[in-house]
């Protein structure tokens, strides 16, 4: 066979389960990863000749397990492997192993991997890097490029994360039912952080960091397959799809951010939106609202509006109020202020924004929104000061370009009498 694209797809699809099973066996991230890589090398060599195995994941686990055992035995006779009785499901021939990889094992092995990578003992940046490397299989070069750091720096970050996993004694077991809900929330947060890292790294049409967004959506779908009746997993996946559906419309030709209300909605991905809307409608029928469902419902209202003026700002305001009650945060209040500005005007919104200044003093979007509201109220000098602060806090060129455009508009507008008197 000359076309080996199917092999890459099979390896990517099988990776989470195979890595999870190998981690359960070896209790060591490095060894599990090396064993999986060796299995992949053998797959690339053998599968073009023999064709796909009945169960690629079982094949990779079987070959990886044997490769890892050989490596341990070669390196040191003192290295102890886990007791055989704990791992009877991995001690069969490949054909028998495939029969044993039922739904329960599939879920537990993948959850094990996700729980290790999203453990709260790891800083958020290490959680993201470890998940992208271990679960998604992105190369260190790909991850470093997405984070805008050197390969050496990213290699160190991943190494530190693995060392912290070992030092903290992070368990390689799947948690019991009592702990599972809390751990699932941590996994969802990690996936959302992966998406946000890609979303915020987008820097104009040619610099869109879509890899991280795509990986986050893939991980979210994976989690949803494990828990298909969990409404918050539906909400998370729907939210990511709705946000990513607008990727092509987020920047103008000069690379500046285009606000949601100014975006060309013809560029939005209708297939993503259609899938997400069906998903959030299904989630809401469970009547167990959570933060991701509410955020997805807000994004859905924007997606359903064919034109900006059709946006249901009253409903968006109510949803943000619900989110404030469920998950109080100055950022949630800041976002709600946008809805209030559309309903009641900039003065009412500014009254909500001003008290947030101390807690959000280092937040780009706080100063950007405040500057915009002051600009609408004709308070140009104050708006200029807010915009200057926003530029200083911009995390990428597209954010800075948008604020500079606002400053240019201010410079072109005639000053009010009150502003002239201040000069």
UniProtKB/Swiss-Prot annotation:
SUPFAM superfamilies: Sigma2 domain of RNA polymerase sigma factors, Sigma3 and sigma4 domains of RNA polymerase sigma factors, TPR-like. It holds the Pfam family DUF6596. InterPro entries: DUF6596, RNA_pol_sigma-70_dom, RNA_pol_sigma70_r2, RNA_pol_sigma70_r4_t2, RNA_pol_sigma_r2, RNA_pol_sigma_r3/r4-like, TPR-like_helical_dom_sf, WH-like_DNA-bd_sf. Disulfide bonds: none annotated. One of its GO terms (biological process) is DNA-templated transcription initiation. Gene3D superfamilies: 1.10.1740.10, Tetratricopeptide repeat domain, Winged helix-like DNA-binding domain superfamily/Winged helix DNA-binding domain. One of its GO terms (molecular function) is DNA binding. PANTHER family: BLL0085 PROTEIN, BLL6612 PROTEIN-RELATED. This is Uncharacterized protein R00370. It comes from Rhizobium meliloti (strain 1021).
């Amino acid at each position: 066979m000359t076309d080996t694209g199917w092999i890459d797809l099979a390896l990517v699809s099988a990776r989470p389960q195979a890595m999870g099973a190998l981690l359960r066996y070896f209790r060591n991230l490095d060894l599990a990863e090396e064993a999986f890589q060796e299995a992949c090398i053998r797959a690339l060599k053998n599968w073009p000749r023999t064709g796909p195995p009945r169960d690629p994941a079982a094949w990779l686990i079987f070959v990886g397990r044997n490769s890892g055992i050989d490596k341990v035995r070669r390196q040191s006779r003192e290295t102890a492997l886990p007791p055989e009785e704990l791992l009877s499901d991995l001690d069969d021939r490949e054909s028998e192993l495939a029969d044993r990889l039922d739904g329960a094992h599939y879920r537990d092995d993948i959850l094990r991997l996700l729980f290790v990578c999203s453990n709260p003992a790891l800083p958020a940046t290490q959680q993201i890097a470890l998940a992208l490397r271990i679960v998604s299989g992105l190369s260190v070069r790909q991850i470093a490029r997405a984070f805008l750091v050197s390969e050496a720096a990213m290699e160190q970050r991943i190494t530190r994360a693995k060392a912290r996993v070992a030092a903290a004694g992070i368990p390689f077991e799947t948690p019991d039912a009592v702990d599972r809900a809390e751990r699932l929330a941590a996994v969802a947060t990690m996936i959302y952080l992966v998406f946000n890292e890609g979303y915020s790294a987008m820097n104009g049409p040619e610099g869109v960091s879509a890899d991280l967004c795509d990986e986050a959506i893939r991980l979210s779908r994976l989690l949803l397959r494990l828990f298909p009746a969990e409404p918050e997993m539906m909400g998370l996946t729907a939210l990511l799809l709705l946000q990513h559906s607008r990727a092509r419309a987020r920047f103008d030709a000069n690379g500046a951010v285009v606000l949601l209300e100014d975006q060309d909605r013809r560029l939005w991905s209708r297939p993503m939106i259609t899938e997400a809307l069906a998903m959030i409608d299904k989630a809401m029928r469970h009547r167990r609202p959570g933060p991701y469902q509410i955020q997805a419902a807000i994004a859905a209202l924007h997606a359903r509006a064919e034109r900006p003026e059709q946006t249901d700002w009253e409903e968006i305001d109510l949803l943000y109020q619900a989110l404030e009650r469920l998950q109080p945060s100055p950022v949630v209040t800041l976002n709600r202020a946008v809805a209030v500005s559309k309903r009641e005007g900039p003065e009412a919104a500014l009254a909500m924004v001003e008290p947030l200044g101390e807690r959000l003093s280092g937040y780009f979007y706080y100063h950007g929104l405040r500057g915009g509201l002051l600009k609408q109220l004709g308070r140009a000098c104050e708006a200029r000061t807010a915009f200057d602060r926003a530029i200083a806090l911009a995390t990428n060129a597209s954010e800075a370009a948008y604020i500079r455009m606002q400053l240019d508009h201010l410079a072109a507008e005639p000053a009010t009498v009150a502003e002239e008197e201040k000069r």
